[in-house]
Amino acid sequence: MGVGFMGAYNLYKNPSGERIASTSRTVYEIDHSLYLNLTNSCTNECYFCPRLHSNFYHGYNLRIQALPNGSELIHMVEFPRRYREIVFSGFGEPTLRLGVIKYVSQWVKDHQGRTRLVTNGHGNLIHKRNIIPELIGLIDTMSISLNADTPDNYIKFCRPQFGIETYTNVIEFIKQSIKYIPTVEITTVASPGINTQKCLELAIELGANFRLRELIPPRHKLNQN
């Protein structure tokens, strides 16, 4: 089957002429990587997040109507080596569905594919344990979003449901990831008010790679239906 979706899939053009999907995508491709959209739910409410003002990202409607299970995702991926990497990501926080991540990533590794997990670093808070050792041999690259240089700024910009202690827990999540995962990168959105230089310096101090992410402006209205 290859790259797949759940439900009918149609394309139309927005006012700028961009072709976009009118039905939500569970699996979508960007730059030869295949992204698995696991959930709409997140433990942050970052003020710059596309999911707060749109259903769309890179022309794909990512507001899924049903949560895909592991078998469905495997069926959609089909040939992992076709892609540069299989990325656990989407509109929400993927570690909310840790079991699915472990199930699918094991299958991907069994079929000689590469994996990456995009996360806000709340996985240990969500599951009340250190989940990183459970991902040894399953995740090749961890991309951890860190959009603030202090606990107070993290509250201001990311509005985490776990409160003021979230920031220090994310830092610890990064440290644990560096211990167990082959490649770890900290990513920061280039948004007004966020001290990206401080985030870069923190990444260097911790021993992680650093990548500055483009701020995605709203281009499509949020559909609440």
Please describe what each predicted stretch is.
Residues 136-151, 210-216:
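Non-cysteine beta-strand/loop elements that form the S-adenosyl-L-methionine
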